[in-house]
Each structure stands twice: as C-alpha cells, then as structure tokens.
C-alpha cells in the first residue's frame, strides 16, 4: 500500500460525505481503541486565574515614619492634613476602593517608600 501525505488525506476527507466520515471515525476507534471524547476532555484548557479589574488599597500600618506616610496619603488622596492623619491613625483602613490594579501598585510603591505597610485586595 502506498503511503499518503497528510495533505492527501485531508483532501480525501473533504471529498467524503458525512456518513463516510462517521464510518471512518468508527473504524479508527475500533482499530486503535481510542475514545475521542476522552481526548476532548483531556484537552480542555485549565481554568485561568480571574484577572481583577478593580482592587482595594488598604493601609495596614503606618510604620516608624508616620509623618511621611501622612504626607503621602494627603498627596495621593487629596485630603487635608488632619483628614490624612485621622485615616493613618485609624489603620488598618481602606485608602481607596474600586481602583485599577496599576494605580493601586503605584500608590502602594509610594506608601511603602514612606514606610507604610499596605495591601492590595
């Protein structure tokens, strides 16, 4: 029997009727003992981690440099000095909710540089 190429095989499939293709599939199952449904289940991609579009920035603690943290909170959130101090003193406290992850990372970097302990949820 002459060996055929993949392209020739595909061209032959294109010329077949649905019934002929079904018969071919059944014959392949029988010949090789393969169950296509088992392969399809195994080929199903694993669920990917959900990407968050909005996060919450929380100040956990002000750290040793409380004054520096108060200044950063004041500048980032546009608060008065007293409001920023109250927010920092009340730690752990939510600084911003429903913000983009990139923005939260930027805020976190500035707060950590000032000595704060921050989390993004």
UniProtKB/Swiss-Prot annotation:
Q: What are the record keywords, sorted?
A: Ribonucleoprotein, Ribosomal protein
Among the Pfam families in the record, one is Ribosomal_L12
- Provide the disulphide bond pattern: none
Q: Which InterPro entries match?
A: Ribosomal_bL12, Ribosomal_bL12_C, Ribosomal_bL12_C/ClpS-like, Ribosomal_bL12_oligo, Ribosomal_bL12_oligo_N_sf
Indicate whether Ribosomal protein appears among the record's keywords: yes
Q: Which biological processes are named by the entry's GO terms? A: translation
- Gene3D superfamilies from the entry? 3.30.1390.10, Single helix bin
> What are the annotated GO cellular component locations?
cytosolic large ribosomal subunit
GO MF, any single term: mRNA binding
| The protein's role, per its UniProt record | Forms part of the ribosomal stalk which helps the ribosome interact with GTP-bound translation factors. Is thus essential for accurate translation.
State the similarity comment. Answer: Belongs to the bacterial ribosomal protein bL12 family.
Assembly and partners are described as:
Homodimer. Part of the ribosomal stalk of the 50S ribosomal subunit. Forms a multimeric L10(L12)X complex, where L10 forms an elongated spine to which 2 to 4 L12 dimers bind in a sequential fashion. Binds GTP-bound translation factors.
What is the name of the protein in this document? Large ribosomal subunit protein bL12
